[in-house]
Amino acid sequence: MVKLIKSIKAHNDKAWCAKSHPTLPLLATASTDRTSHIYNLSAKKNFPLLAKLEEAHKRSVRSVDFKPPLGGVESPVDDFLDLPALATGSFDSTISIWGIDEPEEQDSMDDGDDDDDDEKINDKHAQLLTSINNEWNLMAIIEGHENEVKSVAWNYQGNLLASCSRDKTIWIWETDPETLEEFECISVLSDHQHDVKHITWHPSQNLLASSSYDDTIKLYKQDEDDDDWSCVGILNGHGGTVWCSSFENPTSPTFDANKIRLVSASDDLSVRIWSSIVEQTEQIEDTTDRLPSSIKSTNNEMVWEEEAILPAIHKYAVYSVSWSAKTGKISSTGSDGKLVIYRETESKKWEIESVYESAHGVYEINSVSWCTLDDKTEVLVTAGDDGAINIWEP
């Protein structure tokens, strides 16, 4: 049974998005009021506000995403204090990068770390990096898009940042994840016919998925031979705008190493799961390698199929979907105000586990995301048109 833990009146206008840091108990929000807020995901501390990021954008902040730790979530660099950084995408067509300076307390902590085990050191670092004493500073403003930026997303290693826009393009920016001093555009992808609503990276490889007003989802990879990025898959099946997608995480208990799976949410009221068999993709790559270069399209082409349509429950457009890395459950929400959780049975069928009606009262819900508190408890976080950020016990 879904239970409301905390409702934060975060913004004076629509809250578009709420995302957590991959390893730290930090939550960032995006709003029409042109600001982003950062909160400490600590129930014991009552989810305190750590920072208000403002005056960087002239229009709505539509999307936020924290940079993963150096080396990735599963294999972070041990001898490096990875300071948190946040990307914000705005309707003013720009992207802002925010971060903190190294805390002064770090030097005194390092002196006493020799007697502590790794877990204690990590806990100390987490407390330090999520302290209310840290000042969040604007590090960079990235320009390039012609129209509103709808979504921003870091890859799993934190060296690539993707952005998508109403201008129908996806830009991929490369940076040094240690310094974040410069962002170089290494690719502009123009495969969609209309507004690109959302982008997301695979949790453990450089595979990018985009969702669009043209009713499709497109997948992109970098060519190993010439480093060019190209479309390697097109998912057709939705009968309306695709608002959002989310990859299954390899840490999920339902994960199958032979498959890559993606869940999507659409204006057609459906939530769908797509899968790509790794062996089939490898066979295509092997065949393509034997073809003359004049007729090769790409050696990264992927075979995708629609694996399932989740039980119908939404009455209006489904705006957001999120796949839990901890339990393998999926959550969706949207225009009808419902917060829905689905689970996969042992027979590989999907069923509805719970539904919470009017999760933001009479208001639409724009995003849902699985997040982890400082005590390792998994929660759901929703952002609504009422400006509220709601935190739920699933």
From Swiss-Prot:
Keyword ATP-binding belongs to the record: no
Domain of life: Eukaryota
Pfam families according to UniProt: WD40 (PF00400)
Keywords associated with the record: Cytoplasm, Nucleus, Repeat, WD repeat
Location of this chain's protein in the cell: Cytoplasm; Nucleus
GO terms (BP aspect): iron-sulfur cluster assembly; tRNA wobble uridine modification
PROSITE patterns to which the protein is assigned, alphabetical: WD_REPEATS_1, WD_REPEATS_2, WD_REPEATS_REGION
SMART domains: WD40 (SM00320)
Protein's UniProt keywords contain Repeat: yes
Entry GO CC: cytosolic [4Fe-4S] assembly targeting complex; nucleus
Disulfide bridges in this chain: none
WD repeat residues: 10-49, 56-108, 144-184, 191-230, 237-284, 313-352, 359-394
Quaternary structure, from the entry: Interacts with NAR1.
HAMAP family: ciao1
Described function: Essential component of the cytosolic iron-sulfur (Fe/S) protein assembly machinery. Required for the maturation of extramitochondrial Fe/S proteins.
Family note: Belongs to the WD repeat CIA1 family.
PANTHER family xrefs: CYTOSOLIC IRON-SULFUR PROTEIN ASSEMBLY PROTEIN CIAO1-RELATED, WD40 PROTEIN CIAO1
Record's protein name: Probable cytosolic iron-sulfur protein assembly protein 1
Organism for this UniProt entry: Debaryomyces hansenii (strain ATCC 36239 / CBS 767 / BCRC 21394 / JCM 1990 / NBRC 0083 / IGC 2968)
Gene name linked to the record: CIA1
